UniProtKB/Swiss-Prot annotation:
Organism name: Homo sapiens (Human)
Protein name, as recorded: Down syndrome critical region protein 10
Expression sites (tissue/organ): Expressed in placenta and testis.
Amino acid sequence: MQIVQGFPADAPLCALMWTCSFLLPGLQTETPYPCTSLCLSSSQSAHPPLPVRVFSAESGYGIPFCAEPCSRVTVCHLQAVPVCMPV
């Protein structure tokens, strides 16, 4: 499920408190990636998105969205709402 709605101004700060995990096809475990090393996919994306779930380190709640890997120097472009609440 991909959320492409607008996000609140404090969303990037909120996302910094979360960790991102790629849910790779065929794998039973999740491979963690820092949010700064991925970009959320958009309709203009040339690469197929990977399903990703963002977890809150404090609450343990997660929200799924689609993302694609980016270079380490690329800023994490938030196009899904990193909701800091139970899902």
